[in-house]
Amino acid sequence: MNITIEELEKLEPGTFDVIDMRGETEIAHGAIPGSVAIPEQELLENPPENTGKKLIIVCSRGRVSVDVSEELCGRGYEAYSLEGGYIGWLMSEMKKQEAEEICESVEKSIRKKFHKSIWSNFTKAVRQYELVKEGDRVAVCISGGKDSMLMAKLMQLLQRYGDVPFELTFLVMDPGYNEKNRKKIEENAKILNVPITVFETNIFDVANSVDKSPCYLCARMRRGYLYSKAKELGCNKIALGHHFDDVIETTLIGMFYASQLKAMIPKLHSTNFEGMELIRPMYCIHEDAIL
């Protein structure tokens, strides 16, 4: 049986042992923390006592360990070959370090380089419109675009450095993305250290089945699903990534095409989901500051 590096990282400490079969020279140049060095021949001839723990077998590239793990499974052990071996694990660690550096750079840029154009306008909206209060649990709704990803980082920084204690949930609704788009959203969230919760819907299928105003239907359904999921997760607010330009554009469209003056407002109490509120913390940020 095989186990991926991601699956290994999710195992509870104390429920598994990592056994490194590589040679002494290779191990001297680096090993997985906490692993035990046991050469292949010794491992097969005199395996450790079967305590019920999972055995994660590691070789250089995850090839030799496949046969060894299968042999141990045949003897009653719960053994797994680590996919990619030590090289795969090392590459994963390097990617993590790179992601941490990118995330740190993004956070620093928001508070330093873009302090006036982004951070100050963000905190201005939060204070002026009282968007976040003590004890709030805010579902930050992420579509995967630049605006919602920026909002996620801004809300994280507000939680970290602000004076008002509140909780965050980062919510991604999959309305029917293809695999490539879904993966890109997950990868970007991981790089930015945004712990997303993804839930799936069939909105695209429903919207594509109607001829009249599919965009309007899609938007309405999105909002309803987000409210519903956020409430299910114990949130009392959802945050959307609309910025100043969105507000102006929506107002003008309403005037020119619907003959009505109806603007986006920074916060809105839901009429269909009791106790829920929608907030727009990027209300004062201009789009050219984001681009």
Summary of predicted features, one role per range:
Residues R22-E24, G176, F244, M282:
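Anionic group-transfer/hydrolysis microenvironments
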Residues R22, V64, R222-R223, E287:
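Short, cationic motifs built from Arg/Lys/His that form the positively charged side of catalytic pockets
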Residues V36-I38, Y80, T169-L171, P195-F199, ...:
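General small-molecule cofactor/ligand-binding pocket signal
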Residues A263-E287:
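Short, flexible loop segments at boundaries between secondary-structure elements
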Residues K54-I56, N236-K237:
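Short SAM/SAH-binding signature in class I
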Residues D20-M21, V58, L82, C141, ...:
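Active-site-adjacent beta-strand anchor residues
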Residues E98-I253, Y257-L261, I265, D288:
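ATP-dependent adenylation/nucleotidyltransferase module used to activate substrates
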Residues M1-D17, G23-K54, S60-I110:
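Rhodanese-like catalytic fold shared by cysteine-dependent sulfurtransferases
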